[in-house]
């Protein structure tokens, strides 16, 4: 992504805010959806089930303001302790996904922002998410974060995926 590359080239690490999510989403989904880079204005359903993410009366922006105040304000998180980095990335992803602020592309946007957090900490971006084998664990981990603010399950998955990314990088550079 050009945006992430540009953010990483800045002289100091870029703090996360709602604009970063909007920009990532616009760049990622812009070629596909006319509503890319804008908060959703509709309730969301998964399949034929009930409304899963109702549209709040005040819209999405007030919820993003809370996310900025309570979570994103601690960015950029720079740490030599990888566990702190994974824990923070998991919290950002879980809290963002709990809001589901876009009509489409929330998961992909969350992964790209997590990769920005990792790369700001000299870690590799995640490239090894295996949908078939990891999807149920990933969804369960996100649900644990959404319902109970339990971020550790997702942090553990992120660590596992980072280990895979490192192993792939090493194998390709031997």
Predicted regions and their residues:
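FIC/Doc superfamily catalytic core
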Residues: 1-174
